[in-house]
């Protein structure tokens, strides 16, 4: 494993397993981990639903019911309108991002060392420190925002909102520029917020691992405990902002 200096060590842990060049570069580790964790989420919820009983629920059933009720109640309070897609979408976003973030608690050297022993030089197990992953999530939300804008306002209403709000027809070019910037800023902020928080947390774990072992325990343990709060919080923020953006997009035009 590359690690002759502290800089080499840090760069090694922040480098993806990639194939291809330029625009067609694929981060294989991010794809493997994100799809694997997505499949794990689907399997756990399928298993919980399959084992659901009317009697005393199992631990997995309790967890699934708790998550579904929590997300459903949150979306009902936040999303103004009716849509059968919002609650399942919010549940998927929260659980998927939570599982991806949870990989940050895996010991920093464990998986890279195992992969290096297997002949793989680089392997990052935390997908949310890859901008490609966070932007893929936020761009998907962006397209949903556009779709819900057309659904809620119609093509004419959406165009009118872009062109004539907030300053009326006399400032049409300014309105258009302002609204386009606001629209594009939503997926960018969603992506960078998640990436920035998780990247900073991962970097701190890497820096702690460079210290003597007795200092690692003294600093790493409280940071890991604090990070247990950050992991679900970032997933919740991404979910909530998605629901809020879709609710705003779905609002009917007021006359």
Curated annotation (Swiss-Prot):
Lineage of source species: Bacteria, Pseudomonadati, Pseudomonadota, Gammaproteobacteria, Chromatiales
SUPFAM superfamilies, A to Z: F1F0 ATP synthase subunit A (SSF81336)
Keywords noted in UniProt: ATP synthesis, Cell inner membrane, Cell membrane, CF(0), Hydrogen ion transport, Ion transport, Membrane, Transmembrane, Transmembrane helix, Transport
Originating organism: Alkalilimnicola ehrlichii (strain ATCC BAA-1101 / DSM 17681 / MLHE-1)
The name this protein goes by in its record: ATP synthase subunit a
Role noted for this protein: Key component of the proton channel; it plays a direct role in the translocation of protons across the membrane.
Coiled-coil intervals: none
Main location: membrane
Record-linked PROSITE patterns: ATPASE_A
Bilayer disposition of the protein: Multi-pass membrane protein
Family, similarity comment: Belongs to the ATPase A chain family.
Transmembrane segments: 28-48, 86-106, 125-145, 164-184, 203-223, 224-244
Gene3D superfamilies in UniProt: ATP synthase, F0 complex, subunit A (1.20.120.220)
BP terms from Gene Ontology: proton motive force-driven plasma membrane ATP synthesis
Subcellular location: Cell inner membrane
UniProt-listed Pfam families: ATP-synt_A (PF00119)
NCBIfam families (alphabetical): ATP_synt_6_or_A (TIGR01131), PRK05815.1-1 (NF004477)
A GO MF label: proton-transporting ATP synthase activity, rotational mechanism
GO cellular component terms listed in the entry, alphabetical order: plasma membrane; proton-transporting ATP synthase complex
Subunit composition and interactions: F-type ATPases have 2 components, CF(1) - the catalytic core - and CF(0) - the membrane proton channel. CF(1) has five subunits: alpha(3), beta(3), gamma(1), delta(1), epsilon(1). CF(0) has three main subunits: a(1), b(2) and c(9-12). The alpha and beta chains form an alternating ring which encloses part of the gamma chain. CF(1) is attached to CF(0) by a central stalk formed by the gamma and epsilon chains, while a peripheral stalk is formed by the delta and b chains.
